[in-house]
Amino acid sequence: MQTLIQGAGAFIWPLGFCSFLALFLIIERALALRVSKVAPESVVKSVLTGQPELVGAADGESVAGRLVQRWKDGASGEVLKAWARHELIRLQRGLHLLDSIVAGAPLLGLLGTVAGRAALFPEQGLPDTVTLTRGVGLALSTTMIGLCVAIPSLLATNWLARRLEILSSRLDVLVEALEARRR
């Protein structure tokens, strides 16, 4: 492992930063996109059973609770849907950075590969053994680390996007139920 990190040279810093940022974003978004934080069962059940009045101030901490509060304050129709879209945009926070890491980490690895290959060809003659080893090590290490950052980030991004889609569907049902109640 130490050889891999040393072989990556200066490219280890941006790749390490991408790795830590991705880990932070994955954990933070996984915690933020829990059902209990977005659309708790108690709030959804109260609305779907035709009793949104039972949703209390304590439920206002969740996205669904805030939407019910807006409905109680008189928001309806397009206004309520606009608030739901606003909340969904807030839930997407940070996912664009994770997408950038998925795309950028392999490119940083590729840049390291190019730098390693460039080191193989000195201005004159053939490279010596040390230069050859260092260049190949840089090329392989940065590629491997870039992929090791990107692949788990890609899997997490897909999981979070699916999670967001499911929660969005729950909120759509909630808004439609509130709208039907208003009519």
What are these regions (language model features)?
Residues 3, 121-135:
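Membrane-interfacial hairpin junctions
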Residues 12-25, 99-106, 149-153:
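Alpha-helical transmembrane segments of integral membrane proteins
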Residues 21, 25, 31, 112-116, ...:
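Transmembrane alpha-helix boundary/anchor motif
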Residues 1-42:
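Hydrophobic membrane-targeting segments
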Residues 36-127, 158-183:
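Predominantly long cytosolic amphipathic alpha-helical stalk/bundle segments
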Residues 130, 134-157, 161:
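Pore-lining and gate-forming transmembrane alpha-helices of multi-pass membrane transport proteins
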Residues 9, 23, 68, 109, ...:
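Residue-level signature of catalytic and energy-coupling elements of molecular machines
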